[in-house]
Amino acid sequence: MELPVIQPGRPRETQPPIFEKIGIVGLGLIGGSIAQAARQLWPTSLVIAVDNKDVLETAMRMHAIDVAADDLIVLAEADIVILAAPVKQNIALLDELDEYVRQPAVVTDTGSTKREIVAAARSLPPRFTFVGGHPLAGAARGGLEHARPDLFAGRPWLLTPQSLRSAESLARPHASVSHATPAANASTAASAGPVARALQASDPALERLFAFIRALGAEPRTMTVETHDRMLAYLSHLPQLTASALMQVVGDAVGQDGLGLSGRGLADTTRLASSPADIWKDIAATNADQIGPALDALIAILQDLRRDLFEGERLTEIFTDAARWRELLKR
């Protein structure tokens, strides 16, 4: 494939671009959806994508991107670089940006863990502004074929600015205590609005990123990397591992014929079991210290249920509490 390839035929601009040249590395579900949304929102901006040849050719046929390349050199003039590959690949890509991206740029990622990549980003040259990012808009099935421009509509997009720790410590001295409960952490994250506004006012790059995310339809929220990884261990990583483990147990026990007898409950409960393992291996490896306690908590509940199968007292307590929490779950 000749590189770069420029996609012709753009409609007239509908709103002024926030970034003129949008670089996206990795055109899976998230990267592909960002590309599609950006191309619709800012027709005069260039959407530049880096991936393998097959994915890029598909994206060009879908009119999802303008410039396609299998080499980071195409990002030379990007003013925002979005790393949307698996977590460990994103971390490795940071080392290459200095060589290929020649001008000041906002750099962000879309990975499900934040501590390792934010730590690695501290070695970036000062012309780059790195902000860890995580759009909470995934789906059970990944890949460009499932991308859509409205994927982020109304969804939270978590940001972990490197300047947040000092700002949060001034506003809420106890926000970073490591043994805080998930419920307390949720309260901390929800109350970060004033801090986020202060950060935007003092950081033009962060302000542009907030505007970019809002234009995609998402709701940007800020938190520390520690709070992010602790909360996501329970909100995302534990449900994924649980769904995969449950599907394996059931499949091994009843086989293909038995699965044909299952109702909607099993399908709904194990929807996440279709997720790609390569992405989740990186997530597990970079958040193991937080996922481990979450798994331990689940195992303890399962052991309670196992011991109480005949009596039912503990089972009733667990079902009652679970139903109460389920009613509060945001859909």
Predicted regions and their residues:
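Internal alpha-helical scaffold of NAD(P)-dependent oxidoreductase catalytic cores
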Residues: 152-177, 183-184, 190-271
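Short secondary-structure boundary/capping segments
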Residues: 14, 72-73, 99, 121-122, ...
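Rossmann-like NAD(P)-binding element
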Residues: 71-108
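Residues at the starts of beta-strands that form the adenosine-phosphate
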Residues: 21, 46, 129, 156, ...
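Rossmann-like NAD(P)(H) cofactor-binding subdomain of soluble oxidoreductases
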Residues: 95-145
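Interdomain hinge/lid region at the active-site interface
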Residues: 255-323
